[in-house]
Amino acid sequence: QRNIMTKKPFNPTTDGAQTDFSKKMSYGDYLHIDTILDQQHCLSEAHDEMLFIIQHQTSELWMKQVLHEMKAARRALELEDLPNTMKMLSRVSRILEQLNNQWDVLRTMTPADYTQFRDTLGMSSGFQSYQYRMIEYIFGNRNANMLKSHEHTPDAYNKLKEELARTSFYDEVVGLLFKVLDGNSIKTPLLQLDVPHEPNAEIMARWKIVYENIGEYWSLYELAEKLVDIEDYFRRWRFNHVTTVERVIGFKRGTGGTSGVQYLRRMLEVELFPELWHLRGEL
């Protein structure tokens, strides 16, 4: 007859794990878990409203991290600290990948599920996300007309205006491009701070030099490809948004008053770093 050894259940007190937090900071204390978990306030009895809220709240948390990384990346780029700039851009790509994956969870909600609570949303819409707008502004997609929907929140409105008054991340990249290739910063007339960046022949000509001489300009080439990675994920994020909305509400108008899917499809045409895409046909 074999001796069967029975495993004792894990006992944290005998294994040295901290269990008394009366005078020490715990995991929940550090992360303010109680506060976070108390912020999901459903306005209906619909089961799927909780999913809808958590989808958007977690997206906002990840967008906060994107902004944290992009602002730091811009500061590093201003100092020409390319290794740290690259590191943070790589992280942004991974965050955008995570945001893309989240759409798969929301797509488990059917049209019938959504109609049970859609009317409780009022005029609230992702179109009004201050952080999403800030991300676009930092990348370089700057449309001052979009400020209007943020006037009711002065703090967000002022931060967006401040961002419009300074150079975007892509402007900083282009400035470095001109400095390396021409020995001087980009001419001011090429940079318009409060409008979307448009394809520019002078900028594209310089990127073409970089892409045709990768060995000589490896750092600029790597930086450019990091931006292409980011825009690739960003485009997929917007595309996933379009398909999820169309799958759930079809071509109804959005809760925020936009044309819904038609508006989102127009946003798919936006290019953040146009020269980096257009030059591929010139190589």
Model-identified regions with their sequence ranges:
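Surface-exposed peri-terminal alpha-helical interaction modules
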Residues: 5-283
